[in-house]
Amino acid sequence: MAKATFAAGCFWGVEDAFRQIKGVTSTMVGYIGGHTQNPTYKEVCTDRTGHAEAVEVEFDPSQVSYKELLAVFFQSHDPTQLNRQGPDYGTQYRTAIFFHDPTQEAEAREAIAALDKSGIFKRPIVTQVVGAPEFYRAEEYHQKYFEKQGIRACHLP
C-alpha cells in the first residue's frame, strides 16, 4: 500500500471523490500543514492554526497510480483559487499536494507544469507542493461525511 495526501477545499467532497476510485483502499479526512498539534475543527476554522482540510488516501499502486490520483485531485476542485473553493474561504481551504516521497513530488510538479502549459485553466495553478508533515485525523463526524448524510456532492466543479 502507498499513501497520498491532498488538500482541495472542503474535505467532505474531496474524500468522497477519492473513495470512488478503484484501488483506493481507505480514506481519512483531517488537518495538515499547520503549526499546532492535534487541532480541532473549531480551531482550524479560526484560520489561526495554519492547517488545511485534507484527505489522506491509502491506495494499491498495482490498481491505481499516483498520477491517476493526481488527475482526480485536479478534477475535484479549482486549483487556481488561492485559499478558497466555492463559497468556502480561508487558508484551511487551500489547494495543496503533500508528497510522501521524491517520486510523488516530481509527479506532482510535472502534473502542474503540464496543466499550466495546456491552457485548460485560464489562471495559473496555485497548488502548493510540500513535504507531508504530521496529519491529524479530523473528528469522527467528518469521516465519510457524505455517506453518513446520504448526499453526493457539495460544490465540487
Residue ranges and their predicted role:
Residues M1-P157:
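Flexible coil/turn and secondary-structure edge motifs
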